[in-house]
Regions:
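Short sequence motifs at beta-strands and strand-loop junctions characteristic
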Residues: 48-52, 109-113, 120, 175-182, ...
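Solvent-exposed loop segments that connect transmembrane elements
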Residues: 2-44, 84-104, 142-173, 215-268, ...
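Short loop/turn motifs that connect adjacent beta-strands in outer-membrane beta-barrel proteins
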Residues: 63-71, 192-202, 288-297, 329-331
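Transmembrane beta-strands of outer-membrane beta-barrel proteins
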Residues: 1, 61, 73-77, 131-133, ...
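Outer-membrane beta-barrel "beta-signal"
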Residues: 352-364
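Membrane-embedded beta-strand positions in outer-membrane beta-barrel channels/transporters
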Residues: 46, 57-59, 71, 116, ...
C-alpha cells in the first residue's frame, strides 16, 4: 500500500488514493491552482485493487540428519502485489489545455508466482541460513517520468520507436513482468558476557538480485530526478528542446533548472540493472540486571546497498539505526530509536528522511 500524500516517506504526492493531480504545465506558473485553471494537469482515476481471492501457497520441510539436522524447505506461492504500479491513458485531444483528458491510476498486479528453496542449520554454534527464490513474472514499474511523457504523447519515450508519437487515447500499462531471482545468505550468533551485558546477539545477511531479459526498458529511479537522455540526442544547454527537465519546473529559477539538466540529462544511471546486491548487519546487547524485572537492549543496525539498482537495492545507499529498548516482565516495552540515511546513492529519495521515534507496547 502507498503512504499518504504529504506524509514523511511519500516521495511522489500524486501517487496515493485521493491525491494528485500530476501537474503538467510546460512553462511559466506551475502551481496547482494555475494548472487546474488552464487544464495542464493529468487527473488521477480510481485505484484498481487486487481481488481478495486467488492467493495461496504450499511449503514442504524436511530435517536432514546427515547435515547436522539442517532443515531443507521447498515452497511455492501465488500472490497479488502489495506495491502499486500506474497505468494510464494518453490525452484524447490535442493542445495544452487538453492535458486534462489524460488519466492515470494505481494498479496492483495479480498472480505473481514464487518458487523457493531454503536451507538452515547450525555450524560450530552459529546459525546459518540461505535461500534462493525465483519469480518468473515479477511486475516492475516503469520510470514514472517516461510514463507521464507517454500520456502527453511525447515522441521521445522508450515505449515507441524514436520520433513516433503515441495515438490519441492510447493506453499504457505502467509495468512489465520480468523473471526475477534472489539469493540470500546469512548467519546469527550470540556471545555471552560482552561489555557487561548478559549476551551479545549478532546477525548478518547478504543478498543478490538478478533481473532477466531487462533489455532497453527503464524501470525505477525516483521521479524527482527528472528524465535522462533518450535516443534522440544528448542534452545541449543552448537548446531547450533537449532539456529533460523543462524550464519552470516546480517554479525553479533558470539557474537551478540548468543545474538539474546538467546533472541528469546525460545520466542513464539509477534505473534497474541486471544485477544488484547489498548486505545488512545488526548487533544487540542484552542487560538483565540494570533495572528490576527489566531487560535493557541497546542495538545498532547497518544497511549498505553495494552495487546495482533494483527492487531491493539502490547503489551506494547506506543507513544506520540506533535503538534502546526497555522490556518489563514481557508485558510492557518502551523503545527509543534513531535512523540516519546517507551514502553515495546519487538517486536517493531517503537521505533527507532521517527520523527519531518512540514506541510503547503493551501485551495482554
Amino acid at each position: 500500500m502507498l503512504d499518504g500524500c504529504g506524509t514523511f516517506f511519500q516521495a511522489a504526492d500524486f501517487a496515493p488514493e485521493g491525491c494528485g493531480p500530476i501537474i503538467a504545465a510546460v512553462s511559466g506558473d506551475r502551481t496547482t491552482a494555475n494548472a487546474l485553471a488552464t487544464g495542464t494537469f493529468i487527473p488521477r482515476g480510481p485505484s484498481d485493487y487486487p481481488h481478495d481471492g486467488g492467493q495461496y501457497g504450499l511449503a514442504v520441510r524436511k530435517v536432514l540428519e546427515s547435515l547436522n539436522d539442517a532443515e531443507l524447505g521447498l515452497y511455492y506461492a501465488n500472490y497479488h502485489s502489495r506495491f502499486a504500479s500506474f497505468n494510464g491513458t494518453a490525452v484524447t485531444a490535442r493542445g495544452l489545455s487538453n492535458f486534462k483528458t489524460a488519466s492515470y491510476n494505481s494498479v496492483y498486479p495479480e498472480d505473481i508466482r514464487l518458487f523457493g528453496i531454503s536451507l538452515s542449520g547450525v555450524v560450530g554454534g552459529t546459525a546459518v541460513f540461505g535461500e534462493l527464490s525465483f519469480r518468473p513474472n515479477q511486475p516492475l514499474g516503469f520510470n514514472g517520468n517516461d510514463t507521464v511523457q507517454f500520456l502527453l504523447r511525447s515522441p521521445n519515450t522508450p515505449f515507441t520507436a524514436p520520433g513516433v508519437t503515441p495515438a490519441l487515447g492510447a493506453p499504457i500499462e505502467g509495468y512489465a513482468r520480468k523473471p526475477v531471482s534472489q539469493f540470500s545468505l546469512g548467519a546469527t550468533d550470540t556471545v555471552a558476557n560482552v561489555l557487561g551485558a548478559n549476551r551479545l546477539a549478532l546477525a548478518a545477511e547478504a543478498a543478490v538480485n538478478h533481473i532477466a531479459d531487462l533489455g532497453d526498458e527503464r524501470f525505477g529511479r525516483g521521479g524527482a530526478y527528472g528524465r535522462s537522455e533518450l535516443s534522440t540526442g544528448a542534452y545541449n544547454p543552448a537548446n531547450p528542446a533537449s532539456f529533460c527537465i523543462s524550464p519552470g519546473t516546480a517554479n525553479l529559477d533558470p539557474g537551478q533548472i540548468a543545474n538539474l539538466n546538467a546533472n541528469n540529462c546525460n545520466d542513464n544511471r539509477g534505473f534497474f540493472t541486471d544485477w544488484s546486491w547489498g548486505y545488512r548487519l545488526r548487533g544487540a546487547l542484552s542487560y538483565e540486571g540494570l533495572l528490576p524485572s527489566t531487560v535493557v537492549t541497546p542495538s545498532i543496525n547497518f544497511r549498505h546497498d553495494v552495487d546495482g539498482y533494483g527492487p531491493n537495492f539502490q547503489e551506494g545507499q547506506k543507513a544506520v539505526g540506533l535503538s534502546l529498548l526497555f522490556e518489563y516482565r514481557n508485558d510492557y516495552s518502551l523503545e527509543f530509536a534513531y535512523n540516519d540515511f546517507f551514502g553515495s546513492n546519487d538517486f536517493t529519495t531517503l537521505d533527507d528522511r532521517d527520523f527519531a521515534s518512540v514506541n510503547l507496547k503493551v501485551s495482554f
